[in-house]
Amino acid sequence: MALAREDVVRAGLRLLDEVGLDNLSLRKLAKELGIQAPTLYWHFKNKQDLLDEMAATAMAEADDGGSVPEPGAEWDCWLAWMARRIRRGMLAHRDGALLASASRPAEDRWEYVEGILVMLQKAGFTPAGAMRGIGTLTNYVLGTTLEEQQAANRDDEEAERPDFTAYPMLRDAVLAAADPVARFEHGLSLILDGMRAQLE
């Protein structure tokens, strides 16, 4: 049975979950598929081409959370939904945020961004304000998810835990802000509040 491009991408994502991005190689992927490494070049020009496709697939398959905004919903509802969906797409795979940061945008991504820019400009944002808002939001989602995944990948047993005994306020604040979902939602709200303020 002939190997399809999609089969290679799926195997790549499975291997990513097993070994992480740093240890993902075309040689290991070929072994996983039971083929010789040069065969992969029939489907992808190079490793970067494969990583781009893996990232695009992970994002395309991201769970929409069952709460897709209704047509005509306000711009901030759409941006919040988009941010959460991107985060879920990255969290669905080990090193998903690292994969996203190492990949180039898929061609259809530009059409998606164009639609968001149109929506934001209709809401009253300038072209520059709309683009900066999208960039800030995207960088926030990528950065917080990257930190969340890297923290999860660290060997907590070997890590030296700080002693906050002498700093009770810091200790309480760290514990109170520990939940990654609540932390993400707080930052998301701050960004959207800042964008709303630009329209006032």
Task: Report each predicted region and the residues it spans.
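Amphipathic alpha-helical packing segments from all-alpha helical-bundle domains
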Residues: 81-82, 100-136, 142, 156-166
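Short, basic, alpha-helical segments at the C-terminal edge of helix-turn-helix-like DNA-binding modules
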Residues: 57-61
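Hydrophobic alpha-helical connector segments
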Residues: 64-110, 134
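Helix-turn-helix
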Residues: 7, 11, 15-53
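C-terminal peripheral helix-coil segments that are non-catalytic and often amphipathic
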Residues: 122, 150-200
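Actinobacteria-biased recognition of intrinsically disordered, low-complexity terminal regions
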Residues: 1-6, 27, 200
